[in-house]
Regions:
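Helix-to-loop junction immediately C-terminal to a conserved catalytic motif
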Residues: 52
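Conserved ABC ATPase "signature" region
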Residues: 102-120
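Conserved ABC ATPase signature
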Residues: 124-128
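Catalytic Walker B motif of ABC-type/P-loop ATPase nucleotide-binding domains
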Residues: 149-152
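H-loop/switch region of ABC-family ATPase nucleotide-binding domains
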Residues: 184-185
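A short, surface-exposed alpha-helical micro-motif characterized by mixed small hydrophobic
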Residues: 190-192
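Conserved beta-strand-loop-alpha-helix hinge in the C-terminal portion
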Residues: 204-225
């Protein structure tokens, strides 16, 4: 598999002395569904901002293949919605690419159709449910044809229908061969979809391996609920 992101011994220290990340190294491969777990304060969101080049590491470096620039779905989807309607919002994303109007409209329509929002393209974006807003955020990324998608705590503040909507999108993106990085402490929702599992704790990488092996860890020690306390195995975590 093609190596598309190389995270090489990165550390991030802030002016007040806080160490958010400490010597973290791993690679992301094309087609990965990488689940990164950790409790609040483990460094997940800081790591996301570094991979997406919204911030710079204090030391170490991150190498991203040019054709695999990241598209982000933030924990607060409202912060990504700039248009009054889903159509306006996705068109705003596409216009940044300076495409001909007809091509921009085709991309916007295709992205909204993939996320099941085309029929709602003219509704008020502000009145959408949490799950719909996450889908709209994904639509904007898809319209820009990003191959690497990063989800930061995608299930935060979602009701169960919203969770199912977001998981459904992830399953479809995985089937399309997209590379997904999901940062969450709610691992039971996507553990069965993941191809790799990373655990962060207090800014350090504690585990990088298969989800099956990850479930054998004392996850509670890292502030992560082990789904095997409620389910028998990964097969019980599959979404139908």
């Amino acid at each position: 598999m093609q190596k598309i992101v190389q995270v090489q011994k990165i550390s991030r220290r802030f002016a007040d002395g806080t160490v958010a990340l400490d010597g973290v190294s791993f690679d992301i491969f094309q087609g990965d569904f990488l689940l990164i777990a950790g409790s609040n304060g483990s460094g997940k969101s800081v790591l996301m901002s570094l991979i997406a080049r919204l911030d710079e590491p204090t030391s170490g470096k991150i190498v991203v293949q040019k054709s695999f620039e990241a598209g982000l779905v933030f924990q607060d989807a409202d912060s990504q919605i700039l248009g009054e309607t889903p159509w306006e919002d996705v068109m705003f994303s596409v216009k940044n690419l300076r495409l001909p109007k007809s091509e921009a409209q085709e991309r916007a329509a295709a992205a909204l159709e993939k996320t099941g929002l085309l029929e709602k393209k003219d509704m008020s974006a502000r009145t959408m449910s949490g799950g719909e807003k996450r889908r709209l955020a994904v639509s904007g990324i898809l319209s820009m044809e990003r191959e690497l998608l990063i989800f930061d705590e995608p299930f935060a503040n979602l009701d169960w229908p919203g969770v199912r909507q977001v998981v459904s999108i992830m399953k479809e993106l995985k089937a399309q061969g997209k590379t997904l990085v999901v940062l969450t402490h709610e691992i039971e929702k996507v553990m069965a979809l993941a191809s790799r599992f990373i655990v962060l704790d207090k800014g350090r990488l504690c585990f990088d391996g298969s989800p099956k092996d990850g479930l054998r860890l004392p996850l509670e020690n890292y502030g992560i609920k082990n789904p095997l306390n409620s389910y028998k195995g990964l097969e019980d975590l599959l979404w139908n």
